[in-house]
């Protein structure tokens, strides 16, 4: 039986209209190409978010936008972390400063609102200090758009299902590896996992990857899919209970950014510099200091 196509970029207009009529929900997956150990594809974050969103839309309805692989890194605490966990290896990053990523997100919200979606689920597989900032931006935008908004950042797994009680293993640990293995098996190769401490820290690899489990990952992905389904249903109910608003223009978004969001930037977690940063000879030093702009 052929799969129902839910990927926006692969659908023709009548398919999009039919999917919209069935369930006017849109998934917006975000991520980053960055080090995730020598055993995982560098696009892990967006791959997980996109593939899991596709599963949710296939099972319960909705449309999935193309994954956005440009995300926040290098500045402030991100740069300090990368100096310690990646070092001078070529990182293969697709990084943006935080203000550019967050402003782009505002335009993504405007676009799906203009199309008439009732709910938008923003799923960022890439986490960091911005996990505190994205909800603040969405709270501002929510006051100006009809589409109801929900965001999830990180693995999105509501519980660790590993039976040994050791947890998910942190960044690029067994939790992320297990989830990626479940949805994109060609993007995980455990034979590449280092067997000793030579050249540590192993391209930012996390803990317990030797106990990664694809079958367990499928159970965990099912958890996430059902969570997304429940949130989507709540968004539709919230939309139906409100009066619609006028669609925003590009100029409207610029005004909202300049008057409501930009003044908040100095307080955003992703804009903080709370340490002395990488040493002067580190490749991570150049963008560590956060400029006063945006």
Name what the model sees in each region.
Residues 1-121, 125-294:
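Extended, histidine- and acidic-residue-enriched regions that form the cofactor-binding/catalytic faces
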């Amino acid at each position: 039986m052929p799969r129902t196509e839910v990927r926006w970029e692969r659908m023709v207009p009548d398919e999009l209209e039919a999917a919209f009529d069935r369930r006017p929900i849109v998934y917006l997956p975000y991520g980053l190409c960055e080090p995730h150990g020598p055993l995982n594809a560098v696009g892990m974050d967006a791959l997980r978010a996109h593939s899991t969103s596709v599963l949710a839309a296939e099972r319960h309805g909705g449309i999935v936008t193309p994954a956005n692989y440009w995300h926040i890194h290098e500045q402030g605490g991100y740069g300090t972390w990368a100096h310690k966990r990646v070092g001078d290896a070529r990182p293969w990053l697709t990084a943006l400063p935080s203000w550019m990523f967050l402003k782009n997100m505002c335009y993504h919200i405007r676009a799906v609102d203009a199309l008439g979606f009732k709910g938008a689920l923003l799923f960022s597989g890439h986490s960091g200090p911005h996990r505190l900032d994205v909800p603040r931006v969405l709270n501002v935008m929510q006051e100006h758009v009809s589409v109801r908004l929900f965001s999830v950042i990180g693995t999105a797994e509501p519980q660790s299902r590993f039976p040994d009680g050791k947890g998910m293993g942190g960044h690029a640990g067994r939790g992320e590896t297990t989830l990626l293995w479940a949805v994109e098996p060609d993007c995980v190769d455990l034979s590449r996992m280092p067997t000793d401490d030579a050249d540590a820290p192993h391209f930012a690899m996390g803990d317990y990857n030797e106990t990664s489990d694809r079958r367990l990952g499928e159970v965990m992905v099912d958890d996430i899919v059902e969570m997304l389904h429940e949130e989507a249903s709540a968004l539709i109910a919230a939309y139906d209970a409100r009066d619609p608003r006028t669609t925003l223009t590009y100029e409207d978004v610029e005004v909202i950014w300049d008057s409501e969001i930009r003044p908040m930037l100095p307080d955003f977690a992703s804009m903080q510099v709370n340490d002395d940063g990488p040493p002067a000879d580190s490749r991570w030093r150049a963008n560590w200091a956060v400029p006063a702009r945006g």
